[in-house]
């Protein structure tokens, strides 16, 4: 049963309210084989060619061994381990018609974008998710609404990573994160900002990160 009271149970509202139950059900509907194939397509289990060594993102060495694990993985828990740099690369696809860009540490003048993986999402999927992320910030009920800046096309998604030893561990901490993307404007290049803060359990969860992100964006846009 969903924990959020909203009328239309679809992807857009699930994104707006960050509804874990919706995504758990979606994972079960998709099934473990398609879930695995799509995560592999995004680069899970692969090392990133980066300036320094990075751990590969993973959904567990044995795959999805139960429906419970599959459902939990649908909203980023279970055995999901996502490298933040890899996460940033995945989100670049929503600014590049479904193609992931290769991340690098130092900005240099380049003749063209360096591509990590082409066409990981269809253009239809990109448009659908972009509109949902836009509403995460614009909608007054959105978990990212505190980052809304009037007249600026910001899109985002909040998240919370639980750090605990077991399902019954009540003393574990939480990492709050917020990914924000902004298409290119007349005077600013396209931007993606991935903000992560440790130990947000008693500081408002990912909402703490959203407020910090708005300050950064306002400074950038001056």
Residue ranges and their predicted role:
Residues 1-195, 205:
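Beta-lactam-recognizing serine transpeptidase/beta-lactamase-like catalytic domain environment
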Residues 113-117, 210-222:
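Short, gly/Ser/Thr-rich active-site loops of penicillin-recognizing serine hydrolases
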Residues 197-211:
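A short acidic/glycine-rich loop-to-helix N-cap element
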């Amino acid at each position: 049963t969903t924990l959020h009271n909203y009328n239309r149970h679809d992807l857009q509202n699930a994104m707006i309210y960050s509804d874990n139950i919706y995504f758990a059900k979606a994972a079960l509907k998709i099934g473990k084989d398609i879930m695995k194939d799509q995560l592999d397509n995004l680069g899970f289990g692969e090392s990133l060619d980066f300036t320094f060594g990075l751990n590969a993102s993973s959904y567990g060495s044995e795959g999805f061994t139960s429906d419970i694990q599959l459902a939990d993985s649908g909203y980023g828990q279970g055995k999901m381990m996502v490298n933040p740099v890899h996460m940033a690369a995945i989100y670049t696809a929503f600014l590049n018609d479904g193609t992931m860009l290769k991340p690098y540490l130092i900005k240099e003048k380049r003749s063209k974008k360096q591509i990590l993986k082409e066409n990981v999402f269809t253009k239809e999927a990109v448009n659908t998710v972009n509109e949902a992320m836009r509403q995460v910030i614009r909608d007054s009920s959105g978990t990212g609404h505190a980052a809304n800046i009037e007249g600026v096309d910001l899109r985002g998604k909040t998240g919370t990573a639980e750090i605990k030893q077991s399902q019954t561990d009540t003393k574990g901490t939480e990492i709050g994160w917020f990914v924000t993307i902004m298409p290119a404007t007349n005077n600013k290049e396209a931007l993606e900002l991935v903000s992560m803060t440790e130990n947000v359990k008693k500081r408002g969860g990912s909402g703490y990160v959203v407020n910090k992100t708005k300050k950064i964006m306002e400074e950038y846009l001056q």
